[in-house]
């Protein structure tokens, strides 16, 4: 069963997604990042090129011929055929249709109240379906 991890109070979703992608790549996991829009997907694509001066995180947009062998795939379309099913990083305000295909889902919730309200709805929906949930609040130890 898919494990769902909620990460809340995140000041910058793109930077946080880059950190998760970097950590996943370091542990040899394969990641799909679901962006809210094409613009956000393109911004994440650009941000991953600049994570650090010493790290390179191989990534492509979904649909790229290299997607099956690339550890990080970015998309704004949850209905596209995806090559990986280890981890899904959800940057959207909705429950992805395909979340159960993944071993693990990271729900990234910003400081924005509307984003937090939608995140709470998703948390309740996952809980009603008996998915294992964890909750990490940024800034708390």
Predicted regions and their residues:
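Trafficking entry modules
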Residues: 104-113
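Short, glycine/charged-enriched secondary-structure capping and boundary segments
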Residues: 47-49, 102-105, 121-122
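Helix-rich interaction surfaces within compact, conserved domain-sized segments
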Residues: 97, 115-123
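Positively charged, polar, low-complexity stretches
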Residues: 2-100, 111, 129-132, 136-141
């Amino acid at each position: 069963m898919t494990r769902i991890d909620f990460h809340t109070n995140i000041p910058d979703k793109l930077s946080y997604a880059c950190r998760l992608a970097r950590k996943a790549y370091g542990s040899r996991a394969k990641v799909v990042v679901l962006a809210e829009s094409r613009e956000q997907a393109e911004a994440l694509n650009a941000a991953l090129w600049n994570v650090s001066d010493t790290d390179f995180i191989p990534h492509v947009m979904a649909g790229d011929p290299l997607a099956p062998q690339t550890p990080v795939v970015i998309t704004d379309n949850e209905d596209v055929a995806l090559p990986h099913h280890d981890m899904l990083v959800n940057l959207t305000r909705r429950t992805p249709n395909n979340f159960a295909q993944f071993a693990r889902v990271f729900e990234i919730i910003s400081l924005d109240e509307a984003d937090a309200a939608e995140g709470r709805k998703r948390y309740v929906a996952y809980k009603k379906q008996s998915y294992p949930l964890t909750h990490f609040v940024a800034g708390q130890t």
